[in-house]
């Protein structure tokens, strides 16, 4: 479909797998380390299958997104999966693999742009929206490692 986006992002984090898992599983922590992307997250207590959270986030482009996610899989310290709806609708999966230097992170993100403005502009601005995703993931790469290292202490 024209408004579908599929992203696969991978990188290595110099921090223990358990700490990286804890940071990614608990969306309430995202505004602490995934700045300036995540503005606010409201969640129902500790992360668990079936638990929901609401996110308010933005990229570099001048628009904000509001989503609700529900954890569908939680397999410590390897996998966090969630379904999402709102301005974006789809599924995200974090897969973590232990490496000699820390943790390999893979993020699979398959979403449809349901925000009317995004849906309308996707045929023209898809490259800009993909760039915006890459910018947001770069902020995750910058913030996740130091945050997970602090958790590990």
Predicted regions and their residues:
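Short amphipathic alpha-helical segments
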Residues: 16-19, 132, 136
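Hydrophobic ligand-binding cavity/cleft-lining segments
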Residues: 1-48, 153
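Well-ordered beta-strand positions
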Residues: 12, 72-73, 95-97
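Beta-strand/loop substructures that line and gate deep hydrophobic ligand-binding cavities in soluble
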Residues: 83-135
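Alpha-helix N-cap/helix-start motif
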Residues: 23, 64, 117-118
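Glycine-rich portal/gate segments that line the openings of hydrophobic small-molecule binding cavities
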Residues: 32, 41-91, 101-104, 135, ...
């Amino acid at each position: 479909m024209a408004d579908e986006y599929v992203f696969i992002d991978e990188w290595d984090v110099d921090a223990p797998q358990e700490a990286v898992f804890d940071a990614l599983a608990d969306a309430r922590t995202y505004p602490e380390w995934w700045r300036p992307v995540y503005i606010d997250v409201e969640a129902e207590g500790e992360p668990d299958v079936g638990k929901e959270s609401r996110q308010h986030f933005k990229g570099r482009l001048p628009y904000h997104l509001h989503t609700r996610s529900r954890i569908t899989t939680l397999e410590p310290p390897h996998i966090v999966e969630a379904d999402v709806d709102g301005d974006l609708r789809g599924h995200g999966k974090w897969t973590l693999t232990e490496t000699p230097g820390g943790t390999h992170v893979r993020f699979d993100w398959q979403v449809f742009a349901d925000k009317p403005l995004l849906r309308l502009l996707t045929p023209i601005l898809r490259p800009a929206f993909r760039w915006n995703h890459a910018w947001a993931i770069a902020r995750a790469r910058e913030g996740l490692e130091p945050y997970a290292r602090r958790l590990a202490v």
